[in-house]
Amino acid sequence: MFLLTLKDRKDDGAYAVQNRHGDKVLFLFEEEDDAVRYALQLEEQEDTEMEVVEVDGELAIKTCKLYNYKYAVITPNDIVIPPKLNDNFSKN
């Protein structure tokens, strides 16, 4: 699996998105191509360089569960795009 970090700042942790409830969700991509595509969209939108990092999927999921982090496994059949900056989600 693959996740995203800020380029040259892996120690700052993985990139996560905020869901409509305000919780951060870590995206774990099954395919590197999908992670790269998402990273390019982020770079264009946020003017920040991202890096795609390969991780052991089972270990990443176990770690998320251990620390009660939310995560989503992004399969090749999923379509995800970065949320626009300052997007407001309906609380309903």
Predicted regions and their residues:
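Conserved NAD+-utilizing ADP-ribose enzyme module
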Residues: 1-92
